[in-house]
């Protein structure tokens, strides 16, 4: 919102965007909201990228070309990783229980 002083002695100004000519008053504060609007648009873009990240078919916001399926691959490897460690923990517990039940397995 740009303002041009048409007649500073009479306090008359013109809004450049709309072409409206009006009297300038001391009790009214004029604030430019374009920087705020730019920040809101940037936040909306980040929110859209976060929403798109929930669908594994979409690519990340600032990814290089050819990165389709990145989230799908990451989800698969995450499941394999945690599945491996849960299986190992269960295997250790079963081994400990088997040894406690039958001490002859370790030579005692």
Curated annotation (Swiss-Prot):
Q: Which biological process, per GO, is one annotated for this protein?
A: methylation
Query: Where are the membrane-spanning stretches?
Result: 77-99
- Listed Pfam families: MtrB
- Annotated Gene Ontology cellular component terms: plasma membrane
Entry EC number(s): 7.2.1.4
Q: Name one GO molecular function term.
A: tetrahydromethanopterin S-methyltransferase activity
Q: What does this protein do?
A: Part of a complex that catalyzes the formation of methyl-coenzyme M and tetrahydromethanopterin from coenzyme M and methyl-tetrahydromethanopterin. This is an energy-conserving, sodium-ion translocating step.
What's this protein's name?
Answer: Tetrahydromethanopterin S-methyltransferase subunit B
Lineage here is: Archaea, Methanobacteriati, Methanobacteriota, Methanomada group, Methanococci
